């Protein structure tokens, strides 16, 4: 076998494809398509600006040929095609592309009509003045430098920018599997937002939006509606509608109307827009236009659309908005590299990252300046000491045979401090002392010991420095350095002073480069949020066995005394009954869990509001349920918070835990919440913290209490684990996550119930048979539900006939676990209790109905406490 053949290594093509494509994807994401959140630049932009900085192609110097810069960039830093680099330069020099141009171009750099820029050999460029703020203090070790592609040059990993460039100029790019599209903003507004964040790091998105109301495009125009902006700033994703600025002018003589367009949306090609309008007129898809012309010139844009006599200008304009790019949507997707990883970021995340970057840059700059100041002060100290001892030093130098021996003698002898003593005493002996200085040098025992560097500086001292004027200048410079060192130490020693410096520099940038907003933001009808028109109130949500859903104000139900007959909650169809009941706020989300283990999401106010006697609407008309699929559990959620879990339990005793955020932003079709085996269904859902305890109650009166931590969090499309070991024919009827002390109220089919302290229920292991929760007999019937209550609470019970009663919890006695309970609601023959719900809102005494709560003899008695041996636990 040849040498070449021995170098061939067989590889699995599938593994090689995975590895190579992943490498390619990460290279595109990190090295090409996405900007860094700190400086808002992609690598190619950063390399172009750095190359121009190295060339000295500054804003106040002569222009240089674009080809010269492109050659430096591709030769030293960016080993790609010259067209990619030149296109980047062109875009940074176009006033209609960047809100604040980073390159000052001379020549033809294209137009808003889509005209191409002239070749790079014809155009000339230099850095814009604002671009220097991106690279300010670059030479002061403020950022890390990394090797270029071949290791022959160093380039900055990120720019030490004073400008929040990611927001100010925005960014767009398509990577592998992700993309970014960040709109530009007004510099003054963004800096105001940064200052507000510096003042209060806990500021909300709404608070930041008081300073940054929305994007500010270089082409001005109008943003139609605020809702997309709010969503984008809150979540990192959103959509805004940009509309051209147009007005309808009326000729005073003829009465004819003319539409004048002064500004068009961002990234819209004006020439193509005019072609599209002409095409629509030709195809008669837009009526009422008699003439179209472009009168734009160096003074501004002006597109003239003449309207026919019998047409209405506003109607024609609205048609153009809907059918042309006079109105476009801008999809905001704020993805940037954060710590080297792509991340979708909201407005506060981006500002926080920039301020954090500035804190690091200013700290590193201060350390650098302190080191340089101390090094300079170290030399000035020696010169001041030399001037204080000028005669003996001159004598020593005159008698030294060589400069080397003179230096050695200067280092060996101690010297009087002279004027330096007072200055060092005021500033502190160690203030100007370099960190590298050994202890034997400097001030010791009232004398000054020179280092070799200081001795050399004395030998290099020119004779003119011995004049009185030069002596004073030297001492003044030394005093200024001591003051500078003191200030630098104060910055490093005080976080508040550090933030003051950052604030002062941001205010200076705002003063120098800030301007007025160009883009107007207007409200539109779509901004009238239905939710804003809905009064926040607590309501009762009911779901019948046959799937009829509705909500009613909680205030419609008056609390009644125990044993009352209740009021009708719903007009029920024959053979139907209410089996799901909860109290929620009209603005809450409702997570609807179905018999097939899927979950759907709605707002409470989207449910039908009905009177007490109405059935409501079939939930199949509100949710895309499949045939034979029904809602078996509903859960109100106010906010989808991080760290909160959704705990689920099924009738067969299976339990499962999933993070709440898995259920945010559900699609209309819903998603799988839990995989169910045949014959099982979901009976209970609750929110947990991850460290709670869980109680499962069965129809036969058993309960198991165990720690939630024994169930690990799982994804949506999983089955879960066993929570309780059930007897034959038994099923789980309630899931409770006990919070605080309180008591557990258990209700049975025949209207009986009782309260038992939570502490009475022992904590056992998961997947055991549990202990007795209530004594189940023929008299009280099987358990239909259990809830945790406090003395100030009320409960609502509902029967399969639709009767609902609301009762004070305080009227129900607290007894042990092994009892039957008392009558909570009187049921008619063949009527069973099917639902139980806690109400945590007290009602004034004036609003209560006085209903005789006395019971027939024996009915109200609490079954005596009976010693019942709990069944042994089974692991």
From Swiss-Prot:
Active site: 122
Primary location recorded for the protein, binned into one broad class: cytoplasm
Residue ranges of the region described as Acidic tail: 842-875
Pfam family, one: DNA_topoisoIV
Catalysed reactions listed for this entry: ATP-dependent breakage, passage and rejoining of double-stranded DNA
Resulting phenotype, residue 678 to E: In strain: 227
Biological process according to GO: DNA topological change; DNA-templated DNA replication; DNA-templated transcription; negative regulation of DNA-templated DNA replication; response to antibiotic; response to xenobiotic stimulus
GO cellular component, one term: cytosol
Gene3D superfamilies per UniProt: 3.30.1360.40, DNA gyrase/topoisomerase IV, subunit A, C-terminal, Topoisomerase II, domain 5, Topoisomerase, domain 3
Activity control note: Gyrase is the target of many classes of inhibitors, including coumarins, cyclothialidines, pyrrolopyrimidines, pyrazolthiazoles and (fluoro)quinolones. Quinolones bind GyrA when the enzyme is complexed with DNA and trap the enzyme in a covalent reaction intermediate with DNA. Coumarins bind to GyrB and are competitive inhibitors of its ATPase activity. Cyclothialidines also bind GyrB and are ATPase competitive inhibitors; they seem to act differently from coumarins. Pyrrolopyrimidines inhibit both GyrB and its paralog in topoisomerase IV (parE).
Location of region: C-terminal domain (CTD): 531-841
GO molecular function, one term: ATP binding
PROSITE patterns attached to this UniProt entry: TOPO_IIA (PS52040)
HAMAP family on file: GyrA (MF_01897)
Xref: PANTHER family: DNA GYRASE SUBUNIT A, CHLOROPLASTIC_MITOCHONDRIAL, DNA GYRASE/TOPOISOMERASE SUBUNIT A
Function: A type II topoisomerase that negatively supercoils closed circular double-stranded (ds) DNA in an ATP-dependent manner to maintain chromosomes in an underwound state. This makes better substrates for topoisomerase IV (ParC and ParE) which is the main enzyme that unlinks newly replicated chromosomes in E.coli. Gyrase catalyzes the interconversion of other topological isomers of dsDNA rings, including catenanes. Relaxes negatively supercoiled DNA in an ATP-independent manner. Negative supercoiling favors strand separation, and DNA replication, transcription, recombination and repair, all of which involve strand separation. Type II topoisomerases break and join 2 DNA strands simultaneously in an ATP-dependent manner.
Family listed: Belongs to the type II topoisomerase GyrA/ParC subunit family.
Additional free-text comment from the UniProt record: When the enzyme transiently cleaves DNA a phosphotyrosine bond is formed between GyrA and DNA. In the presence of quinolones this intermediate can be trapped and is used as an indicator of drug toxicity. The enzyme-DNA intermediate is also the target of a number of topoisomerase poisons, including toxin CcdB.
Domain notes: An N-terminal fragment (residues 1-523) can be reconstituted with GyrB, but the complex no longer has negative supercoiling or ATP-independent DNA relaxation activities, although it is capable of DNA cleavage; ATP-dependent relaxation is inhibited by novobiocin and non-hydrolyzable ATP analogs. The fragment has ATP-dependent DNA relaxation and 30-fold improved decatenation activities, unlike holoenzyme it preferentially binds supercoiled DNA.
Protein name: DNA gyrase subunit A
Encoding gene, per UniProt annotation: gyrA
């Amino acid at each position: 076998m040849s040498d070449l053949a021995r170098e061939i290594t067989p590889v699995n093509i599938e593994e090689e494809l995975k590895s190579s494509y992943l490498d390619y994807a990460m290279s595109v994401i990190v090295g090409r398509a996405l900007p860094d959140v700190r400086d808002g630049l992609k690598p190619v932009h950063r390399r172009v600006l750095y190359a121009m900085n190295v060339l000295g192609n500054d804003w106040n110097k002569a222009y240089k040929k674009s080809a010269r810069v492109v050659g430096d960039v591709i030769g030293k830093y960016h080993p790609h095609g010259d067209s990619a680099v030149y296109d980047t330069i062109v875009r940074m020099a176009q006033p209609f592309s960047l809100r604040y141009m980073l390159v000052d171009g001379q020549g033809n750099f294209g137009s808003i009509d889509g005209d191409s820029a002239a070749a790079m050999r014809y155009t000339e460029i230099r850095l814009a003045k604002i671009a220097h703020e991106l690279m300010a203090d670059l030479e002061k070790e403020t950022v890390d430098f990394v090797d270029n592609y071949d290791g022959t040059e160093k380039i900055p990993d990120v720019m030490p920018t004073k400008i929040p460039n990611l927001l100010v100029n925005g960014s767009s790019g398509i990577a592998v599997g992700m993309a970014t599209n960040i709109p530009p903003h007004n510099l003054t507004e963004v800096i105001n937002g940064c200052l507000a964040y510096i003042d209060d790091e806990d500021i909300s998105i709404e608070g930041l939006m008081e300073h940054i109301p929305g994007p500010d495009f270089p082409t001005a125009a109008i943003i139609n509606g605020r809702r997309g902006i709010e969503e984008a700033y809150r979540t990192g994703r959103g959509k805004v509608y940009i509309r051209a600025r147009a007005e309808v002018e009326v000729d005073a003589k003829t009465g004819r109307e003319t539409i004048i367009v002064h500004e068009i949306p961002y990234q819209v090609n004006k020439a193509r827009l005019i072609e599209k309008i002409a095409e629509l007129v030709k195809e008669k898809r837009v009526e009422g236009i008699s003439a179209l012309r472009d009168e734009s010139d160096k003074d501004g844009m002006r597109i003239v659309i003449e309207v026919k006599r019998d047409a209405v200008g506003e109607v024609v304009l609205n048609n153009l908005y809907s059918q042309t790019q006079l109105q476009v949507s801008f999809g905001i997707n704020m993805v940037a590299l954060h710590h080297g990883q792509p991340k979708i970021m909201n407005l506060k995340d981006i500002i926080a990252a920039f301020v954090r970057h500035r804190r690091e840059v200013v700290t590193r700059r201060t350390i650098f300046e302190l080191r340089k100041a101390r090094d300079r002060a170290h030399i000035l100290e020696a010169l001041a000491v030399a001037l204080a001892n000028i005669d003996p030093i001159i004598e020593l130098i005159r008698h030294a045979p060589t400069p080397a021996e003179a230096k050695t003698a200067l280092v060996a002898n101690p010297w009087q401090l002279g004027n330096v003593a007072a200055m060092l005493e005021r500033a502190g002996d160690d203030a100007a002392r370099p960190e590298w200085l050994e202890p034997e040098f400097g001030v010791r025992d009232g004398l000054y010991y020179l280092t070799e560097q200081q001795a050399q500086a004395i030998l290099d001292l020119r004779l003119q420095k011995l004049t009185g004027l030069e002596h004073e200048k030297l001492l003044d410079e030394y005093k200024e350095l001591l003051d500078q060192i003191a200030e630098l130490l104060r910055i490093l020693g005080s976080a508040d002073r550090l933030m003051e410096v950052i604030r002062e520099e941001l205010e200076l940038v705002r003063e120098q480069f800030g301007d007025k907003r160009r883009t107007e933001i207007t409200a539109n009808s779509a901004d009238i949020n239905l939710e804003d028109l809905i009064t926040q109130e607590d309501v009762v949500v009911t779901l019948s066995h046959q799937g009829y859903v509705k909500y009613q104000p909680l205030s419609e139900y008056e609390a009644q005394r125990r044993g009352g007959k209740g009021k009708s909650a719903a007009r029920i169809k024959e053979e139907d009954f209410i089996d799901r009941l909860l109290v929620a706020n009209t603005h809450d989300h409702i997570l609807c869990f179905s018999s097939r283990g899927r979950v759907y999401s709605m707002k409470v106010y989207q449910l039908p509001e009905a009177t007490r006697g109405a059935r409501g609407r079939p939930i199949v008309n509100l949710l895309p349920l499949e045939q034979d699929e029904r809602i078996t559990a509903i859960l109100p959620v106010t906010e989808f918070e991080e760290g909160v879990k959704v705990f689920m339990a099924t009738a067969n005793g299976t339990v499962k835990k999933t993070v709440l955020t898995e259920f945010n932003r559900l699609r209309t079709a819903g998603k799988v919440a839990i995989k169910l085996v045949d014959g099982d269904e979901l009976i209970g859902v609750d929110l947990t913290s991850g460290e709670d305890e869980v109680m499962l109650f069965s129809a036969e009166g058993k309960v198991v209490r165990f720690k939630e931590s024994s169930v690990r969090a799982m994804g949506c499309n999983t089955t879960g684990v066993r929570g309780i070991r059930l007897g034959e024919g038994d099923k789980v009827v309630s899931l409770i996550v006990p919070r605080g002390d309180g008591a557990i109220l258990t209700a049975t089919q025949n209207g009986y119930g009782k309260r038992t302290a939570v502490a009475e229920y022992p904590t056992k292991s998961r997947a055991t048979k549990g202990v007795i929760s209530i004594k189940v007999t023929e008299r009280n019937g099987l358990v239909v539900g259990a809830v945790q209550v406090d003395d100030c609470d009320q409960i609502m019970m509902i029967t399969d006939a639709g009767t609902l009663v609301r009762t004070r919890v305080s009227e129900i006695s607290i007894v042990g676990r092994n009892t039957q309970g008392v009558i909570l609601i009187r049921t008619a023959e063949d009527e069973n209790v099917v639902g139980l719900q806690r109400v945590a809102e007290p009602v004034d005494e004036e609003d209560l109905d006085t209903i005789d709560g006395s019971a027939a003899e024996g009915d109200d008695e609490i079954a005596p406490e009976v010693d019942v041996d709990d069944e042994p636990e089974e692991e």
